[in-house]
């Protein structure tokens, strides 16, 4: 009887195996291209407030970050990217405490915050409190029991939008690419002309006298933005209605004739207000850098 039952079991197993061999594996159904796939959330808006000034940044379709209040502003997006990196890393820091009294960290009624919004319109807000050893105490809204000490964040949201401007680069002017230089101060005008690598004025070789000036001309830089899209009265406030000195340069670049006009106005802190050619933005240039030009304007070629 046992042998008969065993044979019957083996026969049943063989029949099941033969039945399986004749069946084809059903192919996996491809994804329907007409059904939209869920996109991974990515940061698209960043808002920060230091308690008195609020700055808003937005990520455009090309991936670049702009100042949301005026997208024509020439933002140096490295500032926004650095802030974004800091904010995204907050909750990877070790918490200061898991049972914090917010008042102990200046967080009870904080007006300083950073809000990050992603492409699915989900927002996270972090509140900033008091400083400690170069860091600021932070908690995430909705998770107030956990406080973090975040380095550098307070300084990052304390900048003005002008501090974040991508400043224009000025041309490098040398005896090889300059056609002529004109320095005007009040009623005095001085024209400098390059000749075979040297500088002349009224036919005289003044190369040695212009050593400091020519070194600066080859390495001119703007220090900061003072006023972008200034109002009608800004020129007078910055001393640009009666400039201390104006430098006009005719030069060539990539085979084309170019010109540069640098207008130097009044002093502000450690620098002078300046404008560049047709750009009405008021910039700051350091007094140290401008010293050779100002000396030439005041004393001439003695």
Give the role of each language-model region.
Residues 21-302:
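A short-motif feature that recognizes glycine-rich, charge-decorated loops
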Residues 1-19:
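Sec-dependent bacterial lipoprotein signal peptides
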């Amino acid at each position: 009887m046992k042998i008969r039952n065993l044979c019957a079991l083996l026969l049943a197993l063989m029949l099941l195996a033969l039945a399986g061999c004749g069946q084809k594996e059903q192919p996996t159904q491809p994804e329907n291209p007409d059904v939209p796939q869920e996109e991974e959330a990515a940061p698209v808006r960043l808002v920060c407030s230091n308690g008195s000034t609020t700055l808003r940044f937005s990520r455009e379709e090309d991936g670049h970050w702009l100042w949301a209040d005026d997208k024509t502003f020439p933002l140096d997006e490295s500032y926004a990217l650095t802030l974004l990196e800091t904010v995204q890393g907050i909750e990877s820091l070790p918490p200061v405490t898991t049972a914090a009294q917010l008042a102990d960290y200046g967080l009870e009624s904080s007006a300083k915050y950073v809000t990050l919004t992603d492409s699915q319109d989900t927002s996270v807000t972090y509140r900033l409190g008091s400083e400690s050893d170069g860091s600021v105490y932070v908690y995430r809204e909705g998770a107030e029991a956990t406080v973090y000490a975040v380095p550098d964040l307070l300084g990052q949201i304390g900048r003005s939008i002008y501090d974040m401007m991508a400043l224009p680069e000025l041309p490098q002017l040398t005896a090889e690419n300059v056609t002529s230089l004109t320095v005007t101060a009040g009623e005095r005008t001085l024209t400098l002309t390059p000749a075979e690598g040297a500088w002349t004025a009224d036919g005289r070789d003044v190369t040695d006298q212009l050593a400091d000036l020519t070194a600066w001309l080859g390495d001119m830089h703007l220090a900061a933005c003072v006023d972008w899209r200034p109002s009608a009265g800004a020129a007078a406030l910055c001393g640009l209605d009666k400039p201390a000195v104006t430098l006009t340069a005719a030069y060539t670049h990539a085979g084309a004739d170019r010109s540069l006009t640098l207008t130097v106005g009044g002093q502000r802190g450690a620098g002078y207000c300046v404008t560049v050619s047709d750009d009405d933005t008021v910039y700051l240039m350091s007094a140290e850098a401008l010293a050779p030009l100002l000396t030439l304007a005041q004393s001439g070629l003695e």
